Amino acid sequence: MVDPKQEAITAGLRGAFWDADRPVPDDVKLSVHPLRTHDGATISGFFYARGDEKVAAVVMHPREHLVPFYLPAELTRQGIAVCLPTPRLIGNDIRLEHELAILDVAAAVSFLRVQGFEKILLVGNSGGGPLFAFYNQQALLAPEKRLTRTPAGKQVPLAEAEMIPPDGIVFVSAHLGQGRLLMNGVDPSVVDEQDPMSSDPALDPFSTANGFSGKGATYAPEFVARYRAAQIERVRRLDSHALEIVARRVAARKRIKEGGATPADRMEAAYTPIFPVWRTDADLRCWDLSIDPSDRKLGSLWGANPAVSNLGSIGFGRLCTADSWLSTWSGLSSNASMEKCAPAIEQPTLFIEYTGDASTFPEDTQAIFDWLGTSDKQRMKVAGDHHGRPIHEGDPNPRPLVGQRIGEWVAERFSEQSNSTLKEASHAD
């Protein structure tokens, strides 16, 4: 049984491993397969299967390694084979571009199709949700209508790639997208990006003068409105900085192509500066629980010490290049957002939310569900934190319930013939 006191932090995979009493079943075998993406990268596909399944799922995050994650254990208990592709850039924000990450997804889906599965699902958890929504959006387009460039202008070969649409999509604690997640969390009181200690007192979310308290903040509606507008402006400034970097690089490369370039031009053409983005854990909803109330506890995915999460070396979007910022972490420029991509979904979709999630709040989950373009969509609310752990000590473990609901939904949505093993596995469990 998971212990709600064991982990106070849920960012990344903290607290997300499968439960000791609910591992992958003994008759499910693990094999590892090299998967070659269309653009030539090689990723690893960790594949859990009994061997007689007709339905398989891809479970992936754009930068996390999910092999010990709880969802594969629960899905295999429901008779669903699972492919867990490792992203090409594990734990790396510096080069993460979602337009390339969806080629990793494509390689995993193609692998499952070659294996002969009749139905293929995408099961997107947390940041895997918007990643899969983005993949699906592009996969459903005619190849010539797919994106040809990243937000930074880099060419991407989506038109030539095999991008097989899934038969169904499941979202579990999916958020709005990494860019929107960060835009809701950036501290807009930062005055100078080169000085992480700089601050505008009138926008400081951790000032008692503005309503903060370590035991629970109370922010005035007027402050909240100014704060949110200033968050967008900070992201816009960071976008401008990133685009200036890209423009200098592009101009230098143009001079090289035209001939007569100087040594300085060649250095400028190769220069890819890495810049920190400080103070990215300041979503007011994490500290004032009266704003869009839910079952969440005080604090963010990173815990309840904002000094550590905002000024420590680890945090969302902490180190970026212009390319990764614009593609992944910008709430204004990233293509991988639920708002942009969910309307394209036409397949059956199951949307599962945890009521104590500190990354996605009731207004967010309602918006995501409303954006889903399919008319065949179902929603389930489960008491749990971001990674499906009990909110309070002594509460039941919600993870088996989530796995069971996914199994039931798959059995309802797909044929009896395809899902005979699903029902047998579910009943045996």
Label the predicted regions.
Residues K119-Q194:
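Primarily recognizes the serine-hydrolase "nucleophile elbow" in alpha/beta-hydrolase
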Residues L181, A358-D364:
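Conserved alpha/beta-hydrolase "acid-adjacent" motif
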Residues R88-L121, D395-P400:
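Catalytic nucleophile-loop/oxyanion-hole region of alpha/beta-hydrolase
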Residues A383-D429:
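Catalytic active-site module of serine/aspartate enzymes centered on a nucleophile-bearing elbow/loop
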Residues I345, F351-E353:
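Short beta-strand/loop motif that positions the catalytic acidic residue
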Residues P72-D93:
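Conserved alpha/beta-hydrolase
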Residues A202-K340:
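Alpha/beta-hydrolase
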Residues V2-E53, I391-H392, P396-R399:
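N-terminal cap/lid segment of alpha/beta-hydrolase-fold proteins
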